Structures are given as structure tokens and as C-alpha cells.
Amino acid sequence: MEFGALLKKTLKENSVPVTRLSSDIGCTRVSLYSVFNGEKKLSEDTFKFILNTYDFSPLQASELKRLFYLENIGESQKELLFVLKDELETTGKIRPFLSLPLKEIAVCNEETTIVGSAEYYSAIAAFLENEALCKNNVIYTNYSFFDIQADNMLYDFAINNKGNDVLIKHTVRMGGDIDIKERLHNVFSSVKFAKLGHITNASTGGKKNFTFATYFIGAKTVIQYDNENECGFLTGEKAIVDAFRLAAMKNEKKKTVLTGFCESVLDLKEILTPLQKNMVSFLDFRFPANIFTTKKILSETVKDNVPYRDFVIEEFWNHLKKVQSSTPHGLFSQLGLQRFARDGIASDASPEFLHPISTENRIVLFKKYKESVVKNNYCLKIMNSDAVRVTEHFAIEIYKDGFSVLFCSEVNSKENFIGGCYIIYHDAELSKLFTDFEEYIVLSDGTLSKKYAELLIDDLIGQCESVINNG
């Protein structure tokens, strides 16, 4: 019996309700995302129950562990690293995808329909390994947003594929928004991308979904453009379009990747011409941090009225260089971007590859903060929540293993940043320094008055100087 069917049978026999399980094409992976009662997360107890109920092979168990911990990454980052380490010790390598016999792989032409996020790696693997399949083919897949290796695989293929224009489409679940679907269809019709097909996906009960997303333009540029509402990768569209156009103009000779997320796909048509003309650098505007591949573009983009602009540019550029040195091709996968946004770990690599800020640089950083507080009468806000809110122009957000600083030139009525720059530091020790001074938080919303902000910063500087003086 095929692996997915066996798992499905096991779940059924144990009265575990299954609402989605991709077992269509004999793949040795199975999607655990949204399997139980339509939930988006699978409890660890239920997951262990699955592993213990059926006698999986080591390879199957390893794949299940990978899927589970990827799809619950917010809670299980350390477990994920342990699983990958265990896999490395067991098999001798960490596989970015499974390489299965071609007869078990769903590879199709433009008129064919295939389904299932569980098959994503396998289809891509076979597709990339078979040169004959790399011409005039389309892979349709229900894209998994927690795949670590997918972006790098596609990037490698895009820059190495000699002259073949290949289109990979993935499903975009629009939540029944007819208006967005119609807008999508109009955009793709007008710009004449590939045919826009409906996908009948067995794992979604046969509902039709529109597709768009990862495009290989002349095997030189990858545009990964996601309007997946459920993942919340939405941000202001005008800045994105402007930035894409800027990148296209400024980086004519670059052979890199551009990634962008935007609320409205209507703006895609505004950026097509420069993108097809030039090879474009990697950008991300999904999160307040604007990540650029050249310091010049970063300098030209950070507005003049951003507080201590030069320091922001230099610090962010140094941060980006560390990220680029620890990730393949100097870019993030989608998972890497999610972790960057959520946890301050700005890399797909494990945290030990990112170095904390030196004590000397901490002092410089704190003195800059104090200068801003004193000169501009800024308040300072320390938060332990997930949401970033701004008081005046300046905010600090604390994480368990790091902290972030938001420099903002303007604040609107919803307390959202406008024209700001957001820097995240992975530094558990420094994060603890902040949390140790929670007694300075004198207002219920966490805002520090100017007086207490100065006291806090002075104490932090004093601690750093003490470390240096004590050797």
C-alpha cells in the first residue's frame, strides 16, 4: 500500500479526523499541514501518536519529522535543528528534496493538472534532474510556505538553465474573493504571461484555484510574487513597485533574484518591462526591513529625514553582509524571511552562524540612542509583544534571543511605520539586558519618559563598559 494511503488508513482506524491529506501520486512524503479538523497546526502529541502508531521506515519517519517541524516552526526551531542533525547522522546528508523515480513524479505540460503540496520537492527534483523535462513544461503544485530549500533550488535552476523559459505555477488560495480572482485574470491576460489555468485540487475538495507566482524569465530572473492571504505577507504596493523599478534600473549587470510581496497584482504590469530587460537584484518589501544587494541602493532609498540616517544605513548594511555570508547565494528562502520577521534570526542557517554585536559596538549603539533621546526629546518604547508599535520615532522590541530597533520618520494614525528602517539584532545577552530593566517602564503601554529612557541607556552603557574593564 502506498505511503500516504497507509497513513490515512492508520489515522482513520484511530478515529483521527482527516480533512486534507495529499496521497495522490505515490509520493513518500505527506502533507501534515491542515490535516486535523482543518487546523493549521498539528499538536506535538498527535504527531508523536502518528509516528508511534505505524512502523515507518527511517526515511519516512525522517520526512514526517521534517514536515511537522517545518510547519510548526514558530514553536519548534530547536527541535527542527535536532531533527536535521539526526537525519544527517543517520543518512549522511540532509536532502533538500526527495529524488523519486520519474513514473512517481507529477510533471506535466501546460494543459495538464496535478495537485498537492506534499509532492512539491519530488516534482521539482525530477524536473531539475531530467534535462528533457526542462523545455516547455509547467509544474502545477499547491506550494508549501514552509519549505526551506525550495527557493534556492529554483534559483539554482534559473541561473543554470541554458536559455529555456520555464514556468512553475503554484496555487494561490484566495479565500473565495471573487474580485481578486477577476483582477488576477485580467492582469495575466493583459500582460500575456503563460496561460492562466484553473487547478482542480483533490486535497481541497475539487475547488478551483487561480495560479500565479514563480516565473523564470529567460532563465535569468526569478520573480516570486505571493498573494497568499493566509500567510499575511502583505504590505504597501506603491513602495514595492517603485523599488522593483529602481532595482531594474540600477542593477543591469546583476545575475541575482528579485522577490517581492504586494497587496495588488495589478501593479505587476508596471514592472514587467524593466524586469524582462534586465537581470534584477534581490529585494524584499514584505517586512519593514528593506533588504538590498547594494549599499548604494540602500543609501538612495533610506529617506533623509530618518533619524541618524547614516548610522542606520551602515548598521543595516553590515547586518546584511553577515546574512549574505551565511546563506547560499546571499538570499533568504521564504522560511528564512519568516524567521527574520518573527524571531530576528536573519538567516536560513542556524543561529550560531550569526554573531552577536560586540561590546564596543553596543556602547556605540546605546550612545546613538541616547543622543537621539536627548536631542529630539524622543520617548523610548520597550515591548515584549509580537506587534511593532511606534512611540514618536523610536521603538525597541525584545525577543527571547534578540531585539529589534525601529527608526521611523513618520507615524500615521494607526501607529504604523512610514519611511522607516527596521533593524533586528540576534543577541540573547543584549536582549536580557533590556528585560532586566523592566522596572523603568513607568507607563502601562510600556513607554519610557525621556528621563527614564536616559537612565536605562546609561545603565546599559555602564554594564557594557564594566564588561570591557573587567577583561
Segments (PLM) and residue ranges:
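Short amphipathic recognition helices of helix-turn-helix/homeodomain-type DNA-binding modules
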Residues: 45-101
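Residues in the helix-turn-helix
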Residues: 20, 31, 60
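Alpha-helical residues within the helix-turn-helix
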Residues: 12, 23, 52
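A short, Lys/Arg-rich alpha-helix, primarily the initiator
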Residues: 1-20
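Helix-turn-helix DNA-binding elements, focusing on the entry/boundary residues of the two helices
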Residues: 18, 29, 44-47
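Hydrophobic protein-protein interaction segments
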Residues: 109-466
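Recognition helix of helix-turn-helix/homeodomain-like DNA-binding domains
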Residues: 26-42, 66-67
